Structures are given as C-alpha cells and as structure tokens.
Amino acid sequence: MKTPITEAIASADTQGRFLSNTELQAVDGRRAAASMEAARAQKLIDGATSAVYSKFPYTTSTPGNQYASDARGKRDVGHYLRKANHGLSGQAANEANTYIDYAINALS
C-alpha cells in the first residue's frame, strides 16, 4: 500500500540517503494526525454507545450473548456506526439505510 510516508522512505532508500528533517517532521505530523483521528473516533463510539444504552437500558442489564452486557456490545455499536458513516459519506450511499435498519432491528 502506497502512502506518502512509504513513498518518502522508498525515495530516500533509492537515493541511498536517510530521511531529511523535513520528511521526518512530515511523518511525525501524519502520525500525530492519525492519533488524533483515532481519539476522535473512540469518543464518537463512546457517545453512540451511551446513547444506545440509554435508549435501550435492558441491553446492558440482561446477560447473554445477544445483549451488550460486555465490551463486545460497545465494539458492535462502533462497527454499525462506522458502516452507517461509510454509507452516509458516499462510499456506499445506498447501503446506509440498510445498515441503520439492521442495527435498529438487532437492538429491538
């Protein structure tokens, strides 16, 4: 997979040199941006999970594999949120309603 980081490393490697300070700073900047993006995504998942659990409180109080009484429930809410987000962002616009309906039906 080609990314700006891998291309910079490949370019420096073919030229037989180390990465320049500018290239290293760009790599660090991209890593920092990726870390911030991941933190924002986790906050969004936490908020969505809280909203689902407050609307459907029985999902956390009833034990069993089909309820969100453990970390798997939070993981699943994050999964459905990503699917809905991908659909709404235009990557698969016609699938957005399908995933949202599926998530709602799964929680009903």
UniProtKB/Swiss-Prot annotation:
KW Protein biosynthesis (keyword) present: no
Gene Ontology cellular component terms for the protein in this record: phycobilisome; plasma membrane-derived thylakoid membrane
Family annotation (InterPro entries): Globin-like_sf, Phycobilisome_asu/bsu, Phycobilisome_asu/bsu_sf
Topological category with respect to the lipid bilayer: Peripheral membrane protein
GO biological process terms on file: photosynthesis
PTM comment text: Two isomers exist.
Primary localization class, coarse: membrane
Compartments it resides in: Cellular thylakoid membrane
One Pfam family recorded for the sequence: Phycobilisome
Keywords on record: Antenna complex, Bile pigment, Chromophore, Electron transport, Membrane, Photosynthesis, Phycobilisome, Thylakoid, Transport
Known partners and oligomeric status: Heterodimer of an alpha and a beta subunit.
Record function comment: Light-harvesting photosynthetic bile pigment-protein from the phycobiliprotein complex.
Similarity comment: Belongs to the phycobiliprotein family.
Protein name listed in UniProt: C-phycocyanin alpha subunit
Biological source species: Aphanizomenon flos-aquae
Upper classification of the organism: Bacteria, Bacillati, Cyanobacteriota, Cyanophyceae, Nostocales
Name of the gene this protein is made from: cpcA
